[in-house]
């Protein structure tokens, strides 16, 4: 199965990028569409899917909770608030990526401060994140009430999670984030696996639990942040990708397979969104939300039947 996943990614990516050639038309126009529209869109889908898959795997491993993911605990919402603030308030003064990073890291800091006060981790992190997520989403809605209707529409599409009109700058954002933060997580993989045995056992085996936890959370947060910058706050993918990977391999915290599963899910969702009748313009985030909700419902039904 591990050898099949890269092949699936290549097939989906090849088909996704070659769409204009299947539709016929002028060859020069097709070349332009391929280089400036479909190829960047495909590369962003691969990168954002991989980043979200990795981020979800880390959050679920650290919280020891299947609901741990950057969209549920407020990281994506914080990144959205930061990106919108930069694009609407501090126009041309800061890159959108910088605003998104500040927003996401502020949310992470608030969650960690809450956990420090309560002195607990795990489920408490999920609850704290959900509360902060609700507050961040309220800020987003408040921001939308003060902008022009055209801007509000564009922001709403982006907030749904969209791969439309992706550029090479978006490819650069996600393409630079994955090698840096992905390799950082890869370097922490062994201590993270040891920490699954329990913090006390990990400390006995020489793992600095607090340092590994903090670095892993920062790397996972920044991966999710750059996915949001590149493709908008796509929901459920970071939650579902680690579950599917575990179902396939029966092993926890497989970073590379989880990244590929995330890419496959986002590429598939984008192809499904584009397969709808022209003019429907369904954001890919709507598709991932629907598929993710169905998947979780199936899991709940199976658990209930047991």
What are these regions (language model features)?
Residues 1-306:
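Alpha-helical transmembrane segments in inner-membrane proteins
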